[in-house]
């Protein structure tokens, strides 16, 4: 019987173990998409205790706590202490067997805290609380200290076009920070004209760009100014959360002006008008990314804020989102082609939340590759609910079957937690075990030089190359 979470966790044969320990584990982390707070990096935040760093803002854990019947006051309540929330989590973790949270929890205790051979639960919670809090009180366990311990080379934060990026400026000016922290452009509130807050947001964009927006070309001018601002801060990637993937042929500016005017006047838009405006903004933005050498990321298929009562109580991003089932292939094909037809499709990473769409994306990327850029269009790593062993394996296998796994840009945390870098370790172990199994079965050569190069490329080198602006 195998022992739980040894040094060879998830590594089933000698080839896999060699690939992981000798080649994957030492590689730096290039975390090109996350939701870390740039302010916490700039200020080098020191965390008061394990409950704070572990549970604050982590909606993966919040969902598990709710599923275990824990009262909301012990999850997000301001009236309860970090310790009380921590103990609620300690009582919940033994109930998460089979959920990736059980693995992640013990990996996070192992690295960076060095706690091994101890199962986390109510019986061990007090001892672990004390050990971890002692370490969190030291400089090595500040926000930046943890990033350095985890060998992080680069992080891409997620930032709104109206953001001042003041903390990115602060980080860039601080010579003591040897980790690159780049903003990523997230313009969801610009192209989602159907949202209730669209008009209010446009007012904020006007103020940030110093451009009055009454026509579509005004919007282009405002966005161009903000794109320039992001570029000056080292931005090299955009990200778009797309719940419903729409497409319509882009109309002329007169029609776009009319659509924008109707929305500003508070009139209801038709579904066609919404699709026309959304497509026009996305295609125009995509062409700007291509001209700047940026990467365009499309995260497709979430249903957000399903629970109205809890949304009113807690707001968005609190653990009430799930997988959508809208069809995406036709609209995605037309959207990408609208940029590619003028040779203005940027480097692009496609992510789907519904795993039934894996093959859609794995085959779609082959339609729009380009010379001079290996893996120009990527099928991104298993996202969100697919960010677990089975989901990662499905994505790796389907990409390898329908594309080139060797050109894959690899893993990202997509997380708000400084302890989530162990997800890169989790991914690397799964990757090495997959390659090791193929080699052991004679499906690929047992060639250490060939396989090690592929592992190192997927773990770090491909992403570093891909996100470099030439």
UniProtKB/Swiss-Prot annotation:
Annotated metabolic or biological route of this protein: Carbohydrate metabolism; pentose and glucuronate interconversion
This enzyme's EC code(s): 5.3.1.12
Source organism superkingdom: Bacteria
Catalysed reaction equations from the record: D-glucuronate = D-fructuronate; aldehydo-D-galacturonate = keto-D-tagaturonate
GO biological process, one term: D-glucuronate catabolic process
UniProt keyword list: Isomerase
Gene Ontology molecular-function annotations: glucuronate isomerase activity
SUPFAM superfamilies hit by this protein: Metallo-dependent hydrolases
Top enzyme category: isomerase
Xref: InterPro entries: Metal_Hydrolase, Uronate_isomerase
Pfam short name (any one): UxaC
Family: Belongs to the metallo-dependent hydrolases superfamily. Uronate isomerase family.
HAMAP family documented for this protein: UxaC (MF_00675)
Name of this chain's protein: Uronate isomerase
């Amino acid at each position: 019987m195998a022992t739980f979470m040894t040094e060879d966790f998830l590594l089933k044969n000698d080839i896999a173990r060699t690939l992981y320990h000798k080649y994957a584990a030492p590689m730096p982390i290039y975390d090109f998409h996350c939701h870390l707070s740039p302010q916490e990096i700039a200020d080098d935040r020191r965390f008061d205790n394990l409950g704070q760093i572990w549970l604050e803002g982590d909606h993966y854990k919040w969902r598990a706590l709710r599923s275990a019947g824990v009262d909301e006051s012990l999850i997000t309540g301001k009236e309860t202490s970090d310790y009380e929330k921590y103990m609620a989590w300690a009582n919940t973790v033994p109930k998460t067997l089979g959920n990736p949270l059980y693995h992640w929890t013990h990996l996070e205790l192992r690295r960076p805290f060095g706690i091994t051979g101890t199962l986390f639960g109510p019986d061990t919670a007090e001892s672990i609380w004390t050990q971890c809090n002692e370490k969190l009180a030291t400089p090595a366990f500040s926000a930046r200290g943890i990033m350095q311990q985890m060998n992080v080379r680069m992080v891409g934060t997620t930032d709104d076009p109206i953001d001042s990026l003041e903390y990115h400026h602060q980080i860039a000016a601080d010579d003591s920070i040897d980790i690159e922290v780049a903003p990523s452009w997230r313009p969801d509130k610009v192209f989602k004209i159907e949202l209730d807050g669209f008009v209010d947001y446009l007012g904020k964009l006007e103020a940030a760009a110093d451009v009055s927006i009454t026509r579509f070309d005004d919007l282009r001018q405002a966005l161009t100014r903000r794109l320039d601002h992001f570029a000056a801060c080292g931005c090299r990637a955009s990200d778009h959360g797309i719940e419903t993937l729409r497409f319509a042929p882009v109309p002329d500016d007169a029609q776009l002006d009319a659509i924008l005017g109707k929305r500003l006047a508070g009139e209801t838009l038709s579904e066609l008008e919404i699709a026309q405006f959304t497509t026009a903004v996305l295609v125009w933005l995509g062409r700007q990314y291509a001209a700047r050498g940026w990467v365009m990321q499309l995260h497709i298929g979430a249903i957000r804020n399903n629970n109205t009562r809890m949304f009113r109580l807690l707001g968005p991003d609190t653990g009430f989102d799930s997988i959508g089932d809208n069809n995406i292939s036709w609209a995605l094909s037309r959207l990408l082609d609208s940029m590619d037809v003028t040779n203005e499709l940027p480097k692009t990473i496609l992510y789907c939340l519904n795993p039934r769409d894996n093959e859609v994306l794995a085959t779609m990327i082959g339609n729009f590759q380009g010379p001079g850029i290996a893996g120009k269009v990527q099928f991104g790593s298993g996202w969100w609910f697919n960010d677990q062993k089975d989901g990662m394996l499905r994505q790796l296998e389907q990409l390898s079957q329908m594309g080139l796994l060797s050109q894959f840009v690899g893993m990202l945390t997509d997380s708000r937690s400084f302890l989530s870098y162990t997800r890169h370790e989790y991914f690397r172990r799964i990757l090495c075990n997959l390659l090791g199994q193929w080699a052991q079965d004679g499906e690929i050569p047992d060639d250490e030089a060939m396989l090690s190069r592929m592992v190192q490329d997927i773990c770090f080198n491909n992403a570093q190359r891909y996100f470099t602006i030439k």
